[in-house]
């Protein structure tokens, strides 16, 4: 929890500084979608006309019914989801003449509001719940913390099932999944400023299970309707994923041992030298002895990035007394602030050790259990019988490492204006939102409100539901005004708006040297999006609210988009493997190109460019 708190507070502090970049990126995505829709819409009309013998000339002039000789025929278009929401203050003509800009600004404001609620209120309350339930790091990350980052997509899916009765929710889930895999990895690779070596186990574990989830989703939506047992299967699959995360360390140790055994041609023993049982990965459990003697492992490779998970979990070192004290102080027996400081201390110590190793200065164990060049300032004693040998072998003294960077806890406050001019403008722009949230939601990150974390959880959930409804409503109006189908708006604009904050946060984490954690978490969060983000709304509709009913999938092209999603996962993992499990600029450009190709093909499929897939959206003269 301490390391997660360190990362989250750093993300919250820096994400607000990147608000212009986030707004610019989302606006650029909307502009590209408008251009692509205008281009592919004209191409798709010819295919649709040839395939269905549509009588009308253009899609924009379609009516809800196409009567011939006064006899109404079946609809030759798809009902827009805009009619499921309250009537807009502006007519369609007024929106086309400029009023749609107000809706775009409102949607951007809702994106930012969701990011603020999730980061500053919802996620801290989830952390408190995990602490009270004494959940392990892996189980908490797979359940509550995954819900914290994917709540906007979940509520968008709920609104799509129960309110719009359309595909905007499914489109948002699919688009967000592709965005998380391709765009976030690409941005981290381009702008991290360093080469990040990825851990094969985390990527393979989440990618394999995510591939299974996508295959199941394709099988379920292929017939364009969802029945009760299909939603139940998705939920059960997520329960199995939680079990996998619960026994993650044991599985990682098992497969890592098998891999080393195959690579070396001989079996690898994990037995402890003091006669204990097999070392099954329990070294990450704070309850095990911290000063036990274990067999030597090969030294870490020379890399500018500290693999925190790998260092603290996969390769147990010989702990000295100060190091063991730090390990003890990150357990649940100590307060959150103490654990946060000790976790940052461990990270800096390990990074300094890698830097010393890269410079040719090795930390050698001494007979008295101390290490040379230790951060605690201990100096080894030379052998008095051979002073010259001691002088030759003793490396030059190293300066003490810098103190851990203090992570200043930043709380939202509508009553403190920042000093910088740019920050003042953003503060004025977001002041109504900050004031509303601070008045209605107790901030359980503050000590005085810490015991009210359940109140924070409930009120934050209500605000997320309200903001998600407004977000989907505004995006639906924008799509109807610009002639963009709901599925495309979900795959592109909604997905980008709900995922760009996570993208910026992952970039911040990657710049701090924790890119491996950021990449593996993006893939793992997609499992939650598919299995829970779709399984819960579908299950509620077909088993609770209206038992025996079905959920209709209106867009046939959505099946092809999910197939493209499956292909993007396979190509991404293949690219990571061919790049020798390194995240750099070359891999970043590769996955961003894949994301652009996915968007182009998804838009072309929805507009019937290749073959007839969907009826166009119904238009009205207003």
Swiss-Prot record:
Record region (Disordered): 358-408
Protein name in UniProt: Sodium/potassium/calcium exchanger 4
Stretches of the chain found on the membrane's Cytoplasmic side: 119-142, 194-200, 246-457, 501-526, 579-586
Molecular function per GO: calcium, potassium:sodium antiporter activity; calcium-dependent protein binding; calcium:sodium antiporter activity; calmodulin binding; symporter activity
Disruption outcome: Mice have a reduced ability to locate an odorous source and lower body weights. The olfactory sensory neurons display defects in response termination and adaptation but have unchanged sensitivity. Mice show severe enamel defects.
Residues exposed to the Extracellular side: 39-97, 164-172, 222-224, 479, 548-557, 608-622
Reactions it catalyzes: Ca(2+)(out) + K(+)(out) + 4 Na(+)(in) = Ca(2+)(in) + K(+)(in) + 4 Na(+)(out)
């Amino acid at each position: 929890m301490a390391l997660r708190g360190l990362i989250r507070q750093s993300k919250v502090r820096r994400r607000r500084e990147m608000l212009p970049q986030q707004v610019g990126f989302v606006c650029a995505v909307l502009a590209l979608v408008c251009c692509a829709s205008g281009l592919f819409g004209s191409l798709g009309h010819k295919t649709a006309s040839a395939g269905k013998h549509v009588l009308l000339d253009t899609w924009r002039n379609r009516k809800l019914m196409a009567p011939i000789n006064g006899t109404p025929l079946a609809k030759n278009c798809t009902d827009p989801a805009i009619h499921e929401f309250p009537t807009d203050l502006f007519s369609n003509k007024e929106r086309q003449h400029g009023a749609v800009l107000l809706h775009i600004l409102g949607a951007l404001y809702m994106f930012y509001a969701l990011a603020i609620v999730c980061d500053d209120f919802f996620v801290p309350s989830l952390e408190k719940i995990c602490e009270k339930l004494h959940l392990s790091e892996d189980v908490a990350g797979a359940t509550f913390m995954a819900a914290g980052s994917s709540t906007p997509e979940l509520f968008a899916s709920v609104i799509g099932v129960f309110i719009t009765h359309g595909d905007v929710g499914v489109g948002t889930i699919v688009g967000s999944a592709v965005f998380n895999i391709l765009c976030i990895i690409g941005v981290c690779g381009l702008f991290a400023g360093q080469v990040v070596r990825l851990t094969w186990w985390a990527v393979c574990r989440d990618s394999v299970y995510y591939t299974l989830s996508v295959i199941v989703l394709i099988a379920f939506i292929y017939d364009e309707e969802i029945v009760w047992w299909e939603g139940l299967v998705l939920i059960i699959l997520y329960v199995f994923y939680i079990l996998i995360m619960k026994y993650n360390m044991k599985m990682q140790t098992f497969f890592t041992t098998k891999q080393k055994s195959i690579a070396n041609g001989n079996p690898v023993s994990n037995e402890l030298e003091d006669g204990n049982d097999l070392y099954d990965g329990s070294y990450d459990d704070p309850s095990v002895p911290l000063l036990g003697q274990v067999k030597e492992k090969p030294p870490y490779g020379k890399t500018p990035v500290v693999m925190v998970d790998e260092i603290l979990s996969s390769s147990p070192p010989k702990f000295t007394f100060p190091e063991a004290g730090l390990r003890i102080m990150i357990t649940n027996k100590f307060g959150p602030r103490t654990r946060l400081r000790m976790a940052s201390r461990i990270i800096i110590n390990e990074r300094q050790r890698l830097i010393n190793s890269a410079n040719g200065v090795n930390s050698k164990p001494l007979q008295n259990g101390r290490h040379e060049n230790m951060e605690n300032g201990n100096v080894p004693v030379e052998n008095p019988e051979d002073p010259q040998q001691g002088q030759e072998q003793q490396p030059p003294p190293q300066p003490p490492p810098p103190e851990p960077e203090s992570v200043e806890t930043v709380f939202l406050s509508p009553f403190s204006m920042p000093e910088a001019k740019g920050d003042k403008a953003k503060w004025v722009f977001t002041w109504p939102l900050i004031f509303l949230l601070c008045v209605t939601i107790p901030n359980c990150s503050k000590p005085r409100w810490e015991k009210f974390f359940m109140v924070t959880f409930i009120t934050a959930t209500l605000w997320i539901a309200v903001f998600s409804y407004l977000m989907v409503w505004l995006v639906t109006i924008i799509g109807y005004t610009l002639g963009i189908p709901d599925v495309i708006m979900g795959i592109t604009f909604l997905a980008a708006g709900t995922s760009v904050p996570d993208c910026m946060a992952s970039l911040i984490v990657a710049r701090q040297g924790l890119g491996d954690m950021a990449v593996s978490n993006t893939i793992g969060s997609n499992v939650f999006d598919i299995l829970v983000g779709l399984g819960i709304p579908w299950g509620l509709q077909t088993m609770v609210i209206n038992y025996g009913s079905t959920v209709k999938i209106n867009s046939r092209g959505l099946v092809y988009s999910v197939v493209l999603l499956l292909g993007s996962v396979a190509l991404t993992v293949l690219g990571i493997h061919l790049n020798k499990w390194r995240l750099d600029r070359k891999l970043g450009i590769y996955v961003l190109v894949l994301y652009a190709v996915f968007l182009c093909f998804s838009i072309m499929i929805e507009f019937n460019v290749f073959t007839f897939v969907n009826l166009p959206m119904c238009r009205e003269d207003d």
